[in-house]
Amino acid sequence: MRTVAHDVSEQGPSAWQKFLADEPAFFLASEGLLVFPSGAAAKAGIPELVRKIKHIELTWGDDLRVDPLTAEFAVVGASYHEVRVDPKGDRLDEKGFFTGTAEYREGRWQFRNTHWSVIVPPAPTH
């Protein structure tokens, strides 16, 4: 998980390509929506993220959980903090919780599915 945060922060959104399984079984959901229904959809969508995000910083919280299911599969979860800056310089500061199923194949870990859950700020009181 440290490698994921490091590479995404250093290389930008394009780094996600090496961590997301490029296969039909892959999916990525965020806030209750299916963002990428397959590895091919993620691969096709990442270039758009590269255009929309000039800079990104991803850090995981100290609450990382890893539940090994087999020698090749594990479920992971952790809080996260992400700062994204768009090409105009507008900054988005986001916190939430990440979960995913990781698979070890071809000498490395990749996510077979992921879910991002964002902490929604409280509604203003009147």
Q: Language-model features: where?
A:
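A mature extracytoplasmic/lumenal domain signature
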Residues: 20, 32, 78-80, 115
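Short beta-strand edge/turn micro-motifs at domain boundaries
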Residues: 95-124
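A short, structured loop/turn motif at beta-sheet edges
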Residues: 66-75, 90, 102-110
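A solvent-exposed, acidic/Ser-Thr-rich amphipathic alpha-helical stretch
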Residues: 13-69, 93-94
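A short hydrophobic beta-strand element
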Residues: 58, 72-82
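Second-shell loop/turn segments in exported
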Residues: 2-6, 30-33, 88
